[in-house]
């Protein structure tokens, strides 16, 4: 069995090596010739999976995408040909949620404006939005959820309108898929008019899709509104973000919010499980076997961490400032965006760090935030 796989997908060899011949490829430049005799195709979001790519392949048995979203895949085409498809919903949700939370802590420290006491509006309450809410609520932050689709489907959580969210939230975090038409279109959901209408001193975090914000309009608005603080992990025109926009972001990264070691391993592992199910063979591998030990054995706490100490704990796991610096130095180079993604040092999730607590105060919130081993 020939398995064509994006070269940036981790843990392919230990998971799929026994199932067939693995052919690593550049996912962004993948051609029909490279997949014409593949039995299995495993991709990420940089690959457009459609008739143009697959028409020349008569034998494809399975397409898997190690992503939450599927907007890069022509699902109707695959269904029409009877080719099974699976993605990895939720595989990197924890990573994205922690990224957004850490970004807010970093903004709070930079502007000496504590996160505690602020109201955070989350636009899009799917996997990543819910993971972000989980972190915030663990820390005691009031969260407003906006998701008209979830609300219409009967989701029991309390939702507010986008208008209410924009009026009440001090921070807005975006977690919607890109939808280019229809009642709930998200393409340029934040256009010039909406950006200009944001309340004073708002923080705007985007780690879903770059096109959800009109980037050209964002440049125009930022020139007029220095009070609007930005964290941008995604960009219109990836892998070529607008150079003029980058300096306007407090933190800028190359679409790596979901790039935790756990998240990336989880995405590949979910496709492995699905392919084994399709082939009717046992999935003998275990996710825990893939992950290396964390470089900190444990961190001992003498007292309940305040916000400054919490940020320090978060930085033990992931220091956003490092990726921001690398991005600013490299995004304008030829293939710089993709090179940074490919060479990204996979951060760990909070669960990799064990905390030993010796104080008397309540610390369940640290466990709820995701840290492991919290105990007295």
Swiss-Prot record:
<dbReference type="InterPro" id="IPR006139">
    <property type="entry name" value="D-isomer_2_OHA_DH_cat_dom"/>
</dbReference>
<dbReference type="InterPro" id="IPR029753">
    <property type="entry name" value="D-isomer_DH_CS"/>
</dbReference>
<dbReference type="Pfam" id="PF00389">
    <property type="entry name" value="2-Hacid_dh"/>
</dbReference>
<dbReference type="GO" id="GO:0008615">
    <property type="term" value="P:pyridoxine biosynthetic process"/>
</dbReference>
<comment type="function">
    <text>Catalyzes the oxidation of erythronate-4-phosphate to 3-hydroxy-2-oxo-4-phosphonooxybutanoate.</text>
</comment>
<feature type="binding site">
    <location>
        <position position="45"/>
    </location>
    <ligand>
        <name>substrate</name>
    </ligand>
</feature>
<keyword id="KW-0560">Oxidoreductase</keyword>
<dbReference type="InterPro" id="IPR050418">
    <property type="entry name" value="D-iso_2-hydroxyacid_DH_PdxB"/>
</dbReference>
<dbReference type="Pfam" id="PF11890">
    <property type="entry name" value="DUF3410"/>
</dbReference>
<comment type="pathway">
    <text>Cofactor biosynthesis; pyridoxine 5'-phosphate biosynthesis; pyridoxine 5'-phosphate from D-erythrose 4-phosphate: step 2/5.</text>
</comment>
<dbReference type="Pfam" id="PF02826">
    <property type="entry name" value="2-Hacid_dh_C"/>
</dbReference>
<dbReference type="GO" id="GO:0005737">
    <property type="term" value="C:cytoplasm"/>
</dbReference>
<keyword id="KW-0520">NAD</keyword>
<feature type="binding site">
    <location>
        <position position="258"/>
    </location>
    <ligand>
        <name>NAD(+)</name>
    </ligand>
</feature>
<feature type="active site">
    <location>
        <position position="209"/>
    </location>
</feature>
<dbReference type="InterPro" id="IPR020921">
    <property type="entry name" value="Erythronate-4-P_DHase"/>
</dbReference>
<dbReference type="GO" id="GO:0051287">
    <property type="term" value="F:NAD binding"/>
</dbReference>
<dbReference type="InterPro" id="IPR006140">
    <property type="entry name" value="D-isomer_DH_NAD-bd"/>
</dbReference>
<keyword id="KW-0664">Pyridoxine biosynthesis</keyword>
<keyword id="KW-0963">Cytoplasm</keyword>
<feature type="binding site">
    <location>
        <position position="233"/>
    </location>
    <ligand>
        <name>NAD(+)</name>
    </ligand>
</feature>
<dbReference type="InterPro" id="IPR036291">
    <property type="entry name" value="NAD(P)-bd_dom_sf"/>
</dbReference>
<dbReference type="InterPro" id="IPR038251">
    <property type="entry name" value="PdxB_dimer_sf"/>
</dbReference>
<dbReference type="InterPro" id="IPR024531">
    <property type="entry name" value="Erythronate-4-P_DHase_dimer"/>
</dbReference>
<dbReference type="GO" id="GO:0033711">
    <property type="term" value="F:4-phosphoerythronate dehydrogenase activity"/>
</dbReference>
<feature type="binding site">
    <location>
        <position position="147"/>
    </location>
    <ligand>
        <name>NAD(+)</name>
    </ligand>
</feature>
<comment type="subunit">
    <text>Homodimer.</text>
</comment>
<dbReference type="GO" id="GO:0046983">
    <property type="term" value="F:protein dimerization activity"/>
</dbReference>
<comment type="similarity">
    <text>Belongs to the D-isomer specific 2-hydroxyacid dehydrogenase family. PdxB subfamily.</text>
</comment>
<feature type="active site" description="Proton donor">
    <location>
        <position position="255"/>
    </location>
</feature>
<feature type="binding site">
    <location>
        <position position="259"/>
    </location>
    <ligand>
        <name>substrate</name>
    </ligand>
</feature>
<protein>
    <recommendedName>
        <fullName>Erythronate-4-phosphate dehydrogenase</fullName>
        <ecNumber>1.1.1.290</ecNumber>
    </recommendedName>
</protein>
<feature type="active site">
    <location>
        <position position="238"/>
    </location>
</feature>
<feature type="binding site">
    <location>
        <position position="67"/>
    </location>
    <ligand>
        <name>substrate</name>
    </ligand>
</feature>
